[in-house]
Amino acid sequence: MSVQYSLSPQFMLLSNITQFSPIFYLTSFPGLEGIKHWIFIPFFFMYMVAISGNCFILIIIKTNPRLHTPMYYLLSLLALTDLGLCVSTLPTTMGIFWFNSHSIYFGACQIQMFCIHSFSFMESSVLLMMSFDRLVAICHPLRYSVIITGQQVVRAGLIVIFRGPVATIPIVLLLKAFPYCGSVVLSHSFCLHQEVIQLACTDITFNNLYGLMVVVFTVMLDLVLIALSYGLILHTVAGLASQEEQRRAFQTCTAPLCAVLVFFVPMMGLSLVHRFGKHAPPAIHLLMANVYLFVPPMLNPIIYSIKTKEIHRAIIKFLGLKKASK
């Protein structure tokens, strides 16, 4: 049963007139408008955990000189990326749930889309860097301090920062050239390229091919290299002499490996739904998009706080607990 949206005549007229710069209507959770304030409670909780958790990780690393090492510089970059990804969706989500503001101008939609996809590509790159860091630390421990230096991390970080936006800019700019003369309803709380491009009333083959190429040569390539890195790590760990050495080596990889799973599993699920689930209910698309954008920023600080001993000890010390002295 389709859901009807009561758009105002002014909204519809303005959307039809501004064919090349439409105003989109974000539905959020269609059919559940009556309980939207209750729906916002888990979203607000995830926002608070994600923002406070990642800020806390940054403060812990900043205030603890022992954590001023390449591994934790990469963790800081991951926390910053998670903050950016989380904050990118905040304006429209807050506007819908608290101010009943569902409309978004095309320019604002482009900016939000640019931020979401840029930070997604950046997070993929950071996870690749972290896997390479663990690969060198376990497979070549004696050369770690030579290969992985603070200067190398800064250079790699700059590449990561520019890689995401450079890959995203053409996707976003190409949307400006398309007319949008049909429906202007987006079944999300935010703008995603896969959803916006479907509203264009012209041939979008080139845009789809370019978007697929970008995903293959960024996210998918990163995933393959990450899998190879952890495959080599597991091979090296399996060859260690004692079980205690194997356990210690594997423990250093637990947190970054969990971060990889938390990020890539929802992303692959969302991609499969968009590519092959065109007839799936809108709620499925919406659920997968929210899991992909909200869960990694929320869980990453928790994972590193629990699974990384140095972070755990630094948190205890920062909070002034007695265990810090042990």
Curated annotation (Swiss-Prot):
<keyword id="KW-0675">Receptor</keyword>
<feature type="transmembrane region" description="Helical; Name=4">
    <location>
        <begin position="166"/>
        <end position="186"/>
    </location>
</feature>
<keyword id="KW-0552">Olfaction</keyword>
<feature type="transmembrane region" description="Helical; Name=7">
    <location>
        <begin position="283"/>
        <end position="303"/>
    </location>
</feature>
<feature type="transmembrane region" description="Helical; Name=5">
    <location>
        <begin position="214"/>
        <end position="234"/>
    </location>
</feature>
<feature type="transmembrane region" description="Helical; Name=6">
    <location>
        <begin position="253"/>
        <end position="273"/>
    </location>
</feature>
<dbReference type="InterPro" id="IPR017452">
    <property type="entry name" value="GPCR_Rhodpsn_7TM"/>
</dbReference>
<feature type="disulfide bond">
    <location>
        <begin position="109"/>
        <end position="201"/>
    </location>
</feature>
<keyword id="KW-1015">Disulfide bond</keyword>
<dbReference type="GO" id="GO:0004930">
    <property type="term" value="F:G protein-coupled receptor activity"/>
</dbReference>
<keyword id="KW-0325">Glycoprotein</keyword>
<feature type="topological domain" description="Extracellular">
    <location>
        <begin position="1"/>
        <end position="40"/>
    </location>
</feature>
<keyword id="KW-1003">Cell membrane</keyword>
<keyword id="KW-0472">Membrane</keyword>
<keyword id="KW-1133">Transmembrane helix</keyword>
<comment type="similarity">
    <text>Belongs to the G-protein coupled receptor 1 family.</text>
</comment>
<dbReference type="Pfam" id="PF13853">
    <property type="entry name" value="7tm_4"/>
</dbReference>
<dbReference type="InterPro" id="IPR000725">
    <property type="entry name" value="Olfact_rcpt"/>
</dbReference>
<keyword id="KW-0297">G-protein coupled receptor</keyword>
<feature type="topological domain" description="Cytoplasmic">
    <location>
        <begin position="132"/>
        <end position="165"/>
    </location>
</feature>
<dbReference type="GO" id="GO:0004984">
    <property type="term" value="F:olfactory receptor activity"/>
</dbReference>
<feature type="topological domain" description="Extracellular">
    <location>
        <begin position="187"/>
        <end position="213"/>
    </location>
</feature>
<feature type="transmembrane region" description="Helical; Name=3">
    <location>
        <begin position="111"/>
        <end position="131"/>
    </location>
</feature>
<feature type="topological domain" description="Extracellular">
    <location>
        <begin position="98"/>
        <end position="110"/>
    </location>
</feature>
<feature type="glycosylation site" description="N-linked (GlcNAc...) asparagine">
    <location>
        <position position="16"/>
    </location>
</feature>
<feature type="topological domain" description="Cytoplasmic">
    <location>
        <begin position="304"/>
        <end position="326"/>
    </location>
</feature>
<comment type="function">
    <text>Odorant receptor.</text>
</comment>
<feature type="topological domain" description="Cytoplasmic">
    <location>
        <begin position="235"/>
        <end position="252"/>
    </location>
</feature>
<dbReference type="InterPro" id="IPR050402">
    <property type="entry name" value="OR51/52/56-like"/>
</dbReference>
<dbReference type="GO" id="GO:0016020">
    <property type="term" value="C:membrane"/>
</dbReference>
<dbReference type="GO" id="GO:0005886">
    <property type="term" value="C:plasma membrane"/>
</dbReference>
<keyword id="KW-0716">Sensory transduction</keyword>
<feature type="topological domain" description="Cytoplasmic">
    <location>
        <begin position="62"/>
        <end position="76"/>
    </location>
</feature>
<dbReference type="InterPro" id="IPR000276">
    <property type="entry name" value="GPCR_Rhodpsn"/>
</dbReference>
<feature type="transmembrane region" description="Helical; Name=2">
    <location>
        <begin position="77"/>
        <end position="97"/>
    </location>
</feature>
<feature type="transmembrane region" description="Helical; Name=1">
    <location>
        <begin position="41"/>
        <end position="61"/>
    </location>
</feature>
<dbReference type="GO" id="GO:0007608">
    <property type="term" value="P:sensory perception of smell"/>
</dbReference>
<keyword id="KW-0807">Transducer</keyword>
<protein>
    <recommendedName>
        <fullName>Olfactory receptor 51M1</fullName>
    </recommendedName>
</protein>
<keyword id="KW-0812">Transmembrane</keyword>
<feature type="topological domain" description="Extracellular">
    <location>
        <begin position="274"/>
        <end position="282"/>
    </location>
</feature>
